Structures are given as structure tokens and as C-alpha cells.
């Protein structure tokens, strides 16, 4: 809600140099720590190469499928009503859902046991594309929470 004129539109994410894909760039920006973008690119590209070797398919399609399967439609938001806090289910926009999916995929891959981040990320992406893994479980848990609190939907 801008107080002076119209609000600026959100910037559109740029695409990465090799795959020319915005989702890959979003993933790189999320995986980056302490401004080390070149290291983040290295991790992503190694993970993509490993997916290519493991599945013999285009790694971008595996990434898209994994994100599509992990993207939530609903989430719960805490809303305080007359002294008590209710978990109110809300619908999520596609961009916000994509961001959440990327965040969950990275969190799940960081939790995994394994040698390095590229190895763990590639394993998590392949599992998510198949419909299993920690990130999928997180999405299902979020949907269950939203379904359980459907009675509070009118507090939106």
C-alpha cells in the first residue's frame, strides 16, 4: 500500500547463464550463503549434471516437476481473534507457492545425509519429482493443517 502514487511492480527474476531459466536463478539465490553466488551456481550445476546422469532425462524437466509437486495451494496463517489465536487457511499465489516449494526443497536437501550439497540436492529433486521425499511430506502436512482448520476460513 503505497502512500505516494502507485506502488512499484515487483522485479521479475533474472535467468541464469547456462539454462536460461528463472526458476534455476531463484534456486541459486536461495542456496547462496554470504554472497557466494559462484559457489551456489557450482552446486546447482553439479546437481543438474548428477540428475542428468541418474535419470537420463532433461534435468530442467525434473526440476520443474519437483517444484510443481511440492508447490502448496493452501497454507495456514495465525490470526488473533478475540483473545485466541486461530490458524486460518489461506490460498497461496503461484509465485509465493513456488518460493515456498524452493525453500522446502532446499531445507529437505540440507537435512539429508550425504557427501555434499550437490549430491543431496539432486537426490531430493529426483525424489520430489517421483512424489516422495521430505519436501513432499512438508507440503502434505501444510495441506492437512489447512484442512483441519477449515472451520476458521471465515476469519480471512
Curated annotation (Swiss-Prot):
A Pfam family the protein falls into: Ribosomal_S7
Entry GO MF terms: rRNA binding; structural constituent of ribosome
Cellular component terms per the entry's GO annotation: chloroplast; small ribosomal subunit
GO biological process: translation
UniProt-annotated location(s): Plastid, Chloroplast
Keywords on record: Chloroplast, Plastid, Ribonucleoprotein, Ribosomal protein, RNA-binding, rRNA-binding
SUPFAM superfamilies noted in UniProt: Ribosomal protein S7 (SSF47973)
HAMAP family for this protein: Ribosomal_uS7_B
Family under the similarity heading: Belongs to the universal ribosomal protein uS7 family.
Subunit description: Part of the 30S ribosomal subunit.
Role of this protein: One of the primary rRNA binding proteins, it binds directly to 16S rRNA where it nucleates assembly of the head domain of the 30S subunit.
Protein name: Small ribosomal subunit protein uS7c
